[in-house]
Curated annotation (Swiss-Prot):
It holds the Pfam family Terpene_syn_C_2. A motif (DDXXD motif) lies at residues 115-119. The lineage of its organism: Eukaryota, Fungi, Dikarya, Ascomycota, Pezizomycotina. This is Cycloaraneosene synthase sdnA. Mg(2+) 2 binds at D115. InterPro entries: Isoprenoid_synthase_dom_sf (IPR008949), Terpene_cyclase-like_2 (IPR034686).
């Protein structure tokens, strides 16, 4: 969803209600065209997140820098402020110092503005142009790349600036590799979606292939690397490459895009957007409620995968390794939780009244 289509009214929210209240609400679904949605605030997405103390001041500075750099018109600038990306990063990286937090917010704004071009922007169905833009963006991470002219290529300049600040703290070779790899996978997944749009085969794909693309295009893996850097997490490569850690990464990424597909469904219907797992499952024969229930089942399955992975995580002889691995897994969970809370607070999909109803009753009224 582009910045223009991303936000409705700002949302305030209340604690979720389960048990009898939710069951009673489900029984009333027949009175209007509505869907009963999954319990989003469960498992690793449960609990109140911690906020970074630098959120307000740094968020303002990052927004102003971006607005001037890309020469935003007043309408787009207002939308950027409303988006409040600093809140998202605040929940994902609550322990980052001011400098690291600023880099994280700049990165987050870059990611969303850059993605605009391929979502609802001019390159949403132009594969060759999109490929060229993505290759040029990734090239800014090469140490032999010349300094980008901010006037000619403001988004490339933003990303190069973020990369230079990342490098300035001397990240480990493993973290640098993860940074580059996750960004490449993310941007290539976006390119794959552009190709599907261009060829009009968005929903004519295998379910597993669709899910693999979404878990990378959502950008969660890249944000894991941002938080790992911002929190100065120092887990050794042996631990980071363990299957249990990689399963937890996959779960946190999947829960992020599944939450988005649940909460965006009402808005996707209104805008005629088909890039949603609910639509794909309906295309494959499920009813609308059946498709939404399937999303819930996938979320529950992911939560079980997380629990199993934690149970199978080895205990390293070095206690510092165990501590750092735990910090990294907490960071992955925090990214998913941050996206969930930010999605409600920012009003990116549901306005205040709609958001309250979904949180209280798990009922989403449809257009």
């Amino acid at each position: 969803m582009s910045l223009y289509g991303l936000f409705t009214l700002a949302t305030s929210y209340l604690p979720s209600v389960g048990g009898g209240a939710a069951l009673a609400a489900k029984a009333q679904l027949g009175k209007a065209r509505s869907l009963y949605v999954p319990d989003l605030f469960a498992g690793i997405l449960s609990g109140e997140p911690t906020r970074n103390p630098h959120e307000e001041e740094v968020g303002r500075a990052s927004e102003e820098w971006t607005k001037k750099l890309v020469k935003m018109d007043k309408r787009t600038a207002k939308i950027l402020t409303k988006a409040n990306f600093a809140y998202l990063v605040s929940l994902a990286a609550p322990l980052a110092d001011e400098e690291a937090f600023r880099m994280g917010v700049d990165w987050c704004i870059w990611a969303f503005v850059f993605d605009d071009q391929f979502d609802e922007g001019p390159m949403r169905d132009k594969g060759i142009e999109a490929a060229r833009e993505i290759i040029d963006m990734l090239a800014t991470q090469d140490d032999t790349c010349a300094l980008v002219d901010p006037v000619v290529h403001p988004l490339q300049y933003m990303f190069q600036s973020v990369w230079q600040r990342f490098k300035a703290r001397n990240p480990s070779p493993g973290l640098e590799r993860r940074w580059k790899y996750t960004h490449k996978r993310c941007l290539f997944a976006i390119l794959k979606q552009v190709d599907a749009t261009q060829r009009k085969i968005t929903l004519d794909v295998d379910l597993d292939d669709y899910m693999e693309t979404r878990r990378h295009s959502i950008g969660a893996y890249s944000l894991f690397a941002v938080v790992e850097w911002a929190h100065a997490i120092k887990a050794p490569e042996e631990a980071m490459n363990h299957p249990s850690v990689q399963t937890c990464e996959r779960v946190a990424a999947d829960l992020t895009w599944l939450v988005n597909d649940v909460l965006s469904y009402k808005k996707d219907l209104a805008f005629g957007v088909e890039h949603n797992l609910t639509r794909l499952l309906m295309r494959q024969g499920l009813t609308e409620q059946g498709a939404m229930d399937k999303l819930g089942q996938l979320m529950e399955s992911n939560q079980r995968d997380w629990e199993d992975a934690i149970a199978e995580l080895p205990h390293w002889e070095d206690e510092e390794t165990n501590k750092e691995v735990r910090r990294y897994l907490d960071a992955c969970a925090a990214v998913g939780r941050a996206n969930l809370h930010w999605s409600f607070k920012s009003g990116r999909y549901l306005n205040a009244e709609q958001g309250r109803k979904v949180r209280e009753t798990r009922i989403m009224d449809l257009p």
